[in-house]
């Protein structure tokens, strides 16, 4: 979950987000080592009188600083490509939910059910109950079963939007006339918050997303009540 004044990433709730966190740490360590090396070299050149500051040609050095960055880029690219393919892979989803962005709310349709759809609007600040989050609560949450592969079909009715839930590692553009898809699977129950992540007009900040991940039995009860 997110915390006030949080500096790091949110706790991972899906396998994809776990992979993204590991990749972030992996890449950050490489950047830290490179920055430390560059800082050390600059400090040495400024403090050591024996440094060759007027060298015009050094084939060995040029070879090293060509091969070494190439190796580093490969070490970054390989895990990145692996995660990219994992994010696009959808194997036998148990449930499909169609999401449409509007100015300025979301519509959801459970395509596996005959008539299960609703709109999701932000709850105004003056109507919030004690303990609810400002600018993040909605009148209709998206209830989904946990530990099951779910396919989200995402599009827009008007302008560009972006459907994003950070703790699940999700961010997919909602484009008018185009149907994008992504997959999600939560490893534990709970409420997961997101927001529209593409500037879409004056009320862009008032398009929250709330996913309520529950056990399958609870989801079946909820869907029966909604029909």
Curated annotation (Swiss-Prot):
The chain crosses the membrane at residues 15-45, 60-87. One of its GO terms (biological process) is ATP synthesis coupled electron transport. It comes from the Eukaryota. Mg(2+) binds at residue 198. One of its GO terms (molecular function) is cytochrome-c oxidase activity. PROSITE patterns: COX2, COX2_CUA, COX2_TM. GO terms for cellular component: mitochondrial inner membrane; respiratory chain complex IV. Binds a dinuclear copper A center per subunit. Cu cation A1 binds at residues 161, 196, 200, 207. The keyword Metal-binding applies. InterPro entries: CcO_II (IPR045187), CcO_II-like_C (IPR002429), CcO_II_C (IPR034210), Copper_CuA (IPR001505), Cupredoxin (IPR008972), Cyt_c_oxidase_su2 (IPR014222), Cyt_c_oxidase_su2_TM_dom (IPR011759), Cyt_c_oxidase_su2_TM_sf (IPR036257). Component of the cytochrome c oxidase (complex IV, CIV), a multisubunit enzyme composed of 14 subunits. The complex is composed of a catalytic core of 3 subunits MT-CO1, MT-CO2 and MT-CO3, encoded in the mitochondrial DNA, and 11 supernumerary subunits COX4I, COX5A, COX5B, COX6A, COX6B, COX6C, COX7A, COX7B, COX7C, COX8 and NDUFA4, which are encoded in the nuclear genome. Component of the cytochrome c oxidase, the last enzyme in the mitochondrial electron transport chain which drives oxidative phosphorylation. The respiratory chain contains 3 multisubunit complexes succinate dehydrogenase (complex II, CII), ubiquinol-cytochrome c oxidoreductase (cytochrome b-c1 complex, complex III, CIII) and cytochrome c oxidase (complex IV, CIV), that cooperate to transfer electrons derived from NADH and succinate to molecular oxygen, creating an electrochemical gradient over the inner membrane that drives transmembrane transport and the ATP synthase. This is Cytochrome c oxidase subunit 2. It comes from Speothos venaticus. The lineage of its organism: Eukaryota, Metazoa, Chordata, Craniata, Vertebrata. The gene is MT-CO2.
